[in-house]
């Protein structure tokens, strides 16, 4: 999808940068090679992008203009309607919004687009530090200690799927298996927090 948009809009200055949050380059490489993108496609094993841009789930899209300014904060968006019955967000309006932004400068929003990027809470900051420590310990082969810190990170930031679901494959769990569905049930019970609802809550 991104390659198709790049081919369509690239001559107007549009450059998508895709970033995979995966535990190793090998985990993401097959998908990147299959897509054969001509635009930058990165693999972030340290979750730097998630931490710096406040991502709590993927796929998420951030619009950044030529001056380096964020003009549309992190929003859950989808390039196809393959899983629309699961998440309920159609791809068409998003793709049209990208085209409008590139062609006219119009930044379209809707109820799913946060009004701003809220600063992380103290617990969320600690959660990210816990995740980083867990990942370091895991790479050192200290899996039991790592598991404790992964769990603590999830407790401190329970609505952050990049932490909770992102640690599943690292720990040998299936991110689409039973653990994922338990996470989904917990997320539903907690009110289905999204980037937009989080931003709205912190405005008050």
Regions flagged by a language model, labelled:
Residues 124, 157-158:
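Short coil turns that delineate tetratricopeptide repeat
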Residues 65-142, 171:
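Thiol-/selenol-based redox modules, centered on thioredoxin-like
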């Amino acid at each position: 999808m991104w390659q198709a948009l790049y081919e369509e809009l690239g001559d107007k200055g549009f450059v998508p940068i895709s970033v995979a949050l995966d535990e190793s380059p090998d985990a993401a490489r097959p998908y990147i090679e299959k897509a054969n993108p001509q635009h930058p496609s990165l693999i972030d094993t340290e979750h730097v992008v998630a931490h710096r841009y406040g991502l709590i789930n993927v796929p998420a899209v951030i619009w950044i203009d030529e001056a380096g300014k964020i003009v549309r904060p992190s929003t859950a968006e989808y390039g196809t309607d393959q899983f629309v019955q699961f998440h309920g967000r159609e791809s068409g309006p998003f793709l049209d919004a990208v085209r409008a932004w590139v062609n006219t400068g119009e930044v379209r929003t809707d109820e799913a687009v946060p009004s701003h990027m809220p600063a992380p809470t103290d617990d969320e900051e600690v959660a990210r530090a816990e995740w980083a420590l867990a990942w370091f310990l895991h790479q050192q082969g200290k899996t039991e200690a790592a598991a404790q810190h992964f769990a603590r990170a999830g407790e401190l930031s329970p609505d952050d799927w990049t932490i909770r679901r992102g640690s599943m494959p690292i720990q040998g769990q299936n991110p689409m298996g039973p653990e994922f569905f338990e996470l989904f049930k917990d997320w539903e019970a907690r009110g289905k927090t999204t980037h937009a609802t989080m931003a709205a809550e912190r405005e008050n």
